[in-house]
């Protein structure tokens, strides 16, 4: 007979064994384990679940012990019936995912479970069974004994559990600190590769539960179902990518019902999903949906712009599947739904710029990318708080500013009220004074009439003697009423000036300034007109002297500077025509700063310093500058420094390249600019034609930089469009622009000597033979620290094609620095010059009346390195012999030195040569008429060709009106082409192209609007031309 107790025990064991046979393979156990995974990692595990499993294990062990002659019962008793369950037991299950196994292996949890078998001596169970047959009363005593033993064991177990829990808490804290340090190091390493670098050090929590329930967003206002992901087998290999824990990532799998919902997605979403699937290793539609299903539903809420960015960025990734698994799936359950849409947009917009670099580092780094993304999105909360704090600070600042403005307005109102009261009091006082004056006048008149009457009566009654008459006249001298009124009015005015409020003067200033015009005159012809510039000049009150007019003591919205305005060393000096007083005005734009300077005959500089009080102090310094020049033995050298009385180049030089040190005060007005450089007034109109300072400061001679610094930084050569260095030179032709040299610190190098030397381009002067020599070599001082080198060159070796100038700077006998010019090409004659290739072009629409629609009158300004004014082609009559002789002479002159005076310009040279030819040809008039032939003097004037492809419009703009086609003459009316912005010259009505300087021309015509291809070329010169494209 089997005892009832054993039946109950075996029944319990069999039931537990049947449950144990299912093990951890059941889906229910999997769900329970994975749902409690997060609590297990943080020490908060479901004790009921573990107690049940441990009891099952205990019963299984007891059953095995009975089958093996009860060998394991002693082991259970020796362990005090405490079963320790650690993570390797759980990780033995084949159905657990590798990320759970890894965490469980590193974070084991021991839990004490009370055994169902009491601790008793050996064979205690047999003793109890034998007594059971004899007497049932013994059961109650055994049960009571077991209860006592169980209570004692429970107390011991509770104590042990408390100790173990304390130890576990300490271990967890240490492990959390270690994990936190590792995560911080990983976060710092990955900060450079985060889509948006966030500089917020936020504490990272431990690994959280990667929930198996994925909530899907709403699509077309329908709530989609929630699908659970079942983790595949551990041995399943995907594509060899790195997961968030460094292991192979597993494909999530959705139920088959999701495929039908996938078919209902929009076409744009499907196209993106198909692009992802083409670059992946999936073989079935189910696998495609399992990877992209959730991401596809997130895409339904994105805008078209975001979808386009996403679609375009997919084609540039070689491992889009890896990127998808690595970035989106691991942290998609951790990212809040409201941030995921913004995250996708920011991520792909950032990856489009740094796709290769960021994707490579993202896929190759064996770090926990989930924690990085999690910390990134947790920083959104901090960013929101920071933004809120910033907004609060801004609001507080605005409130403070508003309060300050309110207080200031109140103070101003109070001051105005006080001033008004004072004015009222002054007016009352004036009225009282006027009344008193009137009363006094009345009294005086009455007294005077009374005295006159008395005097008349006295004369009638008494005899008149000379003494009495004189005394009486002294006593009865009449009062001058007009003088009395004048004195009273002066006293009143003095009282008013003493008590006048401050704002009264400002009102006068504003009223006076309103009289100035508010806009630039519409007439493009600026000869004799003043310039009104609204953008580049302001007047700070600290720099205005007290002796200035009232309208200059306040910063107005417009600034009027008349035609006599002079710019000197970052200051604008104005000269009054009456007293020649100078007023300093600050010139804000350093790119437009200019000056006209001069030096007196004693080489002294008068520096005017303005202080805050408006007083001026003048200091005088004497500068000594020596310059030596090297010329050929056949030419006379000029060793003296020539001071240029005609102005300076300073308005074309930016402030950072100006000289530092003493400045020069102008002793007289100067209206002219140096030869070859535009005037400051003409420079001020270039922005109206569309020229920008950035373009004007580009290099003119393409063989060098725009600002060529010396080796040690002592000096700088200017090579811009406004101050160019010639790119080509001919025999003895003077360079009109020359070379402008700026010394950086004039005070330190006040006695510097500049020595220019010529070197051939082929560096063939090593043999000691000169290849080039200066025909003219003059260095003139514009102002202290700024020099202009005027030169002309003669070639001694015909094989040389170019040269450069080396400027050596000496302090005494020591060379302190040097600098080279760009390469300058050498031509036999100006007619051999290349066609203008690099041309800056600007235009304005003129107000000239035009009747046809789409046709406008346009005025152009063109700037290039060298624009040559050629001679107009003419027919001459001369004898054959003289023609041949003249041609031979011209060839000889062109091949070598020539007989042209270098002091004249190119036009004068050609005209003089032509006159000589004509005079020599005139001596053959006595010869037979048969010996006379007609010869053509081939000139090479400048011409401009405009071509509009769409309109098939073609127009040639010649240098002279005589070369215009008869059908195009109406496009060049005299009133249009004679208008010029050049204040130095009046334009001839026969000149269509007007040469303002050696590098700037202006011309005008009537043409239709369109996109033009413009060519600048010289007539009768067969060389390559480079067109420019211009829109009107």
UniProtKB/Swiss-Prot annotation:
Signal peptide boundaries: none
Biased composition, class Low complexity, residue ranges: 884-907
InterPro entries according to UniProt: Mediator_comp_sub12
Region feature (Disordered): 54-80, 391-451, 884-934
Disulfide cysteine pairs (residue numbers): none
Protein name: Uncharacterized protein DDB_G0289975
Organism from which the protein derives: Dictyostelium discoideum
Lineage: Eukaryota, Amoebozoa, Evosea, Eumycetozoa, Dictyostelia
